[in-house]
Amino acid sequence: MKDTKKMTTFDAVMIAEGVYPGDTDQMQEAWQILVDTGLAWSLQGWFGREATRLIEAGVIQPFPRP
């Protein structure tokens, strides 16, 4: 995935699942997109559990963000 384009929800899912490689910033952006769009709560259960863990750890923000 090129850094010059906006990350799509598809890209975010692929990065979260490890199909696409991503650095720490890209992983954080991917999970934030999944939370912000609500996909984290409508995909397989582990997405929601991981999103909750990342929110509780302060890695990403809950939606809506301040």
Locate each region found by the language model.
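Catalytic phosphate/metal-binding cores of nucleic-acid and nucleotide-processing enzymes, i.e., regions
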Residues: 1-66
